[in-house]
Amino acid sequence: MYNARSEPLDRAPMSAANEALIRRFYDAFARRDAEAMAACYHPDARFSDPAFPALQGAEIGDMWRMLCSRAQQFSLEYSKVQASGERGSAHWEPRYLFSKTGRMVHNIIDAQFRFADGLIIEHKDHFDFWRWSRQALGAPGLLLGWSGFLRAKVQAEAAKGLSLYRSKRA
């Protein structure tokens, strides 16, 4: 037998649990509760987005701790939460002050998830880097946001910032 999403009925409870996990994650994010966010991830989890392309394990929780601790004029809305027994997705839109430039950013992000043992094992955030860079960086983002050069520079700065944050926590 199948439910309304054409899944076997024995997978329906897992779908509901994974959907609740995604909602718990974004509710925690809206409160800037990085500890609750980190608790949603499997110890072997992997994360990627245009700024942090390859985080794993404890790096993910530390990224959220760093971002939540620095967040200014922050708000978050999320929608379109869906989950199956193995995969999920959500749409989310944070608004925040980018501290390096003092510019307001409204990012539009689509997230994809995979689950294992009732936790997030893989999380990929997709957003338009050029759009983000125009808002966050102003003229440099407008002129170079499409280029691999600027993306690599942002990734290097993000990695350096996370490494420094992690060394201070240790």
Predicted segments with their positions:
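Soluble or luminal CAZymes and related metallo-dependent hydrolases
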Residues: 17, 59, 105
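Hydrophobic pocket/interface hotspot
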Residues: 22-25, 37-38, 45, 60, ...
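Short, low-complexity N-terminal intrinsically disordered segments enriched in polar/charged residues
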Residues: 1-39, 43, 157-170
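Alpha-helix initiation/capping motif
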Residues: 11-15, 53, 102
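Aromatic side chains
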Residues: 25-29, 41, 47, 52, ...
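A solvent-exposed, acidic/Ser-Thr-rich amphipathic alpha-helical stretch
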Residues: 34-38, 42-88
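A beta-strand edge to alpha-helix "cap/lid" segment located at domain peripheries
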Residues: 2-10, 68-77, 82-170
